[in-house]
Amino acid sequence: MHALQAKILDPRIGNEFPLPAYATTGSAGLDLRAMLKEDTLLEPGQTLLIPTGLSIYIGDPGLAALILPRSGLGHKHGIVLGNLVGLIDSDYQGELMVSCWNRGHTAFNIAVGERIAQLVLVPVVQAHFELVEAFDESQRGAGGFGHSGSH
């Protein structure tokens, strides 16, 4: 398990609400909570930037974090991330914020402390461009959308 530096920015974390933790030994994501001042109604089509009350510092340029939606919120209520996925670079040290978008047809109440997203650490490979006149031939070539089959 990799050590991750974290700062609690909202004193309710660790007291009223638990620190992010893996739910099972096979869990990939840590749940992030809505550390709002009060319950908030998210209307259909509305987007809201929600504080998590937590900042992290990954430090290792070989790692990054992704903020991903919780599957149940999207499937059952139409609550997804406004930016679809959040990328946290290894040198970022500010508060983790979650952009929530209600793509559903009914208003959704976000309760204080509700689990709204999940944080997943991922490996990073940085690349540099090697400019070429032509690519080595491949089986796929430049075939794009739908090229590898109809379904």
Curated annotation (Swiss-Prot):
Family matches, as Gene3D superfamilies: 2.70.40.10
Organism: Pseudomonas syringae pv. syringae (strain B728a)
Keyword Metal-binding appears in the UniProt entry: yes
Function summary: This enzyme is involved in nucleotide metabolism: it produces dUMP, the immediate precursor of thymidine nucleotides and it decreases the intracellular concentration of dUTP so that uracil cannot be incorporated into DNA.
GO MF term (any one): dUTP diphosphatase activity
Protein name: Deoxyuridine 5'-triphosphate nucleotidohydrolase
Binding positions for substrate per the UniProt entry: R70, S71, G72, N83, L87, I88, D89, M97
Catalytic activity: dUTP + H2O = dUMP + diphosphate + H(+)
Cofactor: Mg(2+)
UniProtKB keywords: Hydrolase, Magnesium, Metal-binding, Nucleotide metabolism
One GO term (biological process): dUTP catabolic process
EC numbers for this chain: 3.6.1.23
Enzyme's top EC category: hydrolase
Pathway(s) it belongs to: Pyrimidine metabolism; dUMP biosynthesis; dUMP from dCTP (dUTP route): step 2/2
PANTHER family: DEOXYURIDINE 5'-TRIPHOSPHATE NUCLEOTIDOHYDROLASE
Family note: Belongs to the dUTPase family.
Superkingdom of source: Bacteria
NCBIfam families: dut (TIGR00576), PRK00601.1 (NF001862)
